């Protein structure tokens, strides 16, 4: 084991390409000890609420996330202790009763729209990235994802974007850009920026005597 696991935070608007950047970095270090944690698995449990109330939840607001639970898990992983990662059911709009066992690794990638919003999370990170992508492209990606992966209708996705996602992005997500060590324009298509990130991460790992 090395001195301490390295935590990389990757933030950005919904549909910005965060997941693509995360996967690209993950693939570069696939032969090493690395894991990914998605912030949106840590939405608050809503099983106590009627389904109709869950439908009205603002999932783009910082209060939608159970950051206490997420921080607890990150701290466990930093101490090389295993966790039971939650599963979020997007069709039922609540946390599943099932979990995923996760073993500690030397590199932890934490990805989500608001991972840079909470100072407690930022303080756990060795590197903070913000994926910056044009709003038109982000909404197209979100429509495709929510229809294909989350069983949503196009009308509901667009209505949610206009009434919730866009204002929440402007109010909470975009401002976290100032906390980023590095801003990656054009998301997962920016291979030059991703290669630079990989080099920087390798340097941090070497300093921590992990590689």
UniProtKB/Swiss-Prot annotation:
It catalyses: uridine + ATP = UMP + ADP + H(+); cytidine + ATP = CMP + ADP + H(+). It is an enzyme of class 2 (transferase). It comes from the Bacteria. Pathway: Pyrimidine metabolism; CTP biosynthesis via salvage pathway; CTP from cytidine: step 1/3; Pyrimidine metabolism; UMP biosynthesis via salvage pathway; UMP from uridine: step 1/1. InterPro entries: P-loop_NTPase, PRK/URK, Uridine_kinase, Uridine_kinase-like. Its EC number is 2.7.1.48. GO terms for molecular function: ATP binding; cytidine kinase activity; uridine kinase activity. NCBIfam families: PRK05480.1, udk. This is Uridine kinase. It comes from Bacillus velezensis (strain DSM 23117 / BGSC 10A6 / LMG 26770 / FZB42) (Bacillus amyloliquefaciens subsp. plantarum).
């Amino acid at each position: 084991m090395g001195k301490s696991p390295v935590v990389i935070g990757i933030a950005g608007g919904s549909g910005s390409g965060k997941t693509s950047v995360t996967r690209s970095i993950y693939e570069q270090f696939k032969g090493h000890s690395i894991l990914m944690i998605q912030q949106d698995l840590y939405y608050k449990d809503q099983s106590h609420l009627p389904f109709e109330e869950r439908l009205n939840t603002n999932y783009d607001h910082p209060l939608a996330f159970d950051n206490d639970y997420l921080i607890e898990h990150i701290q466990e992983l930093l101490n090389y202790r295993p966790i039971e990662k939650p599963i979020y059911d997007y069709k039922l709009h609540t946390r599943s009763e099932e979990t995923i066992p996760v073993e500690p690794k030397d590199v932890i990638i934490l990805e989500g729209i608001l991972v840079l919003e909470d100072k407690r999370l930022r303080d756990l990170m060795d590197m903070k990235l913000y994926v910056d992508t044009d709003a038109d492209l982000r909404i197209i990606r979100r429509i495709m994802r929510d229809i294909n992966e989350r069983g949503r209708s196009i009308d509901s996705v667009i209505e949610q974007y206009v009434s919730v996602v866009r204002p929440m992005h402007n109010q909470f997500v975009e401002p976290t850009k100032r906390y980023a060590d590095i801003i990656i324009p054009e998301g997962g298509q920016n291979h030059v920026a991703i290669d630079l990130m990989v080099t920087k991460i390798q340097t941090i790992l070497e300093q921590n005597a992990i590689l």
